[in-house]
Amino acid sequence: MAATKHRASKPGPISPNSSTKVWLFSLLLTIQYGAQPLISKRFTRREVIVTSSVLACEVVKVVSAFILMAKDGTLKRLYKEWTLIDSLTASGLPAAIYALQNSLLQISYKNLDSLTFSMLNQTKLFFTALFTYIILGQRQSIQQIGALFLLIIAAILLSIGEGSSKASSTDSPDEILFYGIVPVLVASVLSGLASALCQWATQVKKHASYLMTVEMSVIGSLCLLASAHKSPDGTAIRQHGFFYGWTPLTLIPVTMNAVGGILVGLVTSYAGGVRKGFVIVSALLVTALLQFVFDGKPPSPYCLVAFPLVITSISIYQKYPYRLKKKD
């Protein structure tokens, strides 16, 4: 939880008990990430306004986090120890960075072909490792850096297999550079920075994962409401109502997405942003598997090539952590 009296210190090694939690949360998040596209496609009608489902997800996330805090006893201490400054320091900056990152990605995707976008977007894994070192002092071994290379290659292959073959929407090199390449690279840098800041807040400042989830959800919702004032979604909500196109089944993907948001916080808190990257890429394989099982869509050749790369990269990253060299 938010601890104003805790002294900042570098995160120590993961204990056996925490290691079990890391694997459990990572597995659950992988399944959630992998299943979310299919669940959303099956249970969310086209008429549903995107902003309404996102805001509903944030509400479910906040309520769930409060319930979990009440269960583990941190909610009682929240009233005495919570401060606005701590909240803005721990959650406000990452939330603002993520909002800017998403906007940059939307701009970039419209001006780049899928392959270029996927390749540049996956550099966020390296920037996460870089900022984790700068902010937290956590180093990567040579083997782990190699594992990150393998993971990025796998992510690119999976993105090619699942993505479209759309061409760039413009032939102007300057527009491709300034409205395509530059935005996605800046977004990757921001993604790595925000991930490292979240890890710093939970591991060093001892800001509780559940509390951080609540704070980032509230800040994100306020930003979304502000932007919806003049957006097409805002107009649609005013004309048709907040729950336009909803059915009782719409709550399934909304709730599942909220659970995923809580799991992201837990994985970042226990394992860090770099390992979260492994989870997200692994989830693409789960999506391909579920599409084959439920939709009869066979995995692409890219997916089959990427599978051993993901397994190998995870194995190497876990087996060869960075170790300080002993002085003679």
What are these regions (language model features)?
Residues 1-328:
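Polytopic endomembrane small-metabolite transporters, centered on the Drug/Metabolite Transporter
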